[in-house]
Amino acid sequence: MSKKRLTGVVVSNKMDKTVVVEVTRKLEHPVYKKYIQRSKKYYAHDEKNECKAGDTVLIEETRPLSKMKRWRVVEVLKREVIAEETLNTKESEEV
């Protein structure tokens, strides 16, 4: 049986080797037939501490690693560039 894979955005990376990933899905309201967004947060294992807040990542289901961690980061699909740009502009202003 294949493992579930989800795509989401890293919300927090303040823990060691753990990131919080928010996965958003769209579903149709049963009565009003309007599409609404629902999101859920997953704790995922990030072995190399390479994920930053805002990155889009692919996570995969795995065995329980701790009380709340049941997922692991497979790959970083898209890096968040804005955080790095603001850091570089602050450094150039100081110099």
From Swiss-Prot:
Keyword set includes Transmembrane helix: no
Record-level GO cellular component terms: cytosolic small ribosomal subunit
Entry's transmembrane regions: none
UniProt GO MF annotations: rRNA binding; structural constituent of ribosome
Keyword terms of this UniProt record: Ribonucleoprotein, Ribosomal protein, RNA-binding, rRNA-binding
GO process terms (BP): translation
InterPro entries: NA-bd_OB-fold, Ribosomal_uS17, Ribosomal_uS17_bact/chlr, Ribosomal_uS17_CS
NCBIfam families tied to this protein: PRK05610.1, uS17_bact
Family: Belongs to the universal ribosomal protein uS17 family.
Role played: One of the primary rRNA binding proteins, it binds specifically to the 5'-end of 16S ribosomal RNA.
HAMAP family: Ribosomal_uS17_B (MF_01345_B)
Subunit structure: Part of the 30S ribosomal subunit.
Protein name as catalogued: Small ribosomal subunit protein uS17
Organism encoding this protein: Pseudothermotoga lettingae (strain ATCC BAA-301 / DSM 14385 / NBRC 107922 / TMO)
The gene coding this protein: rpsQ
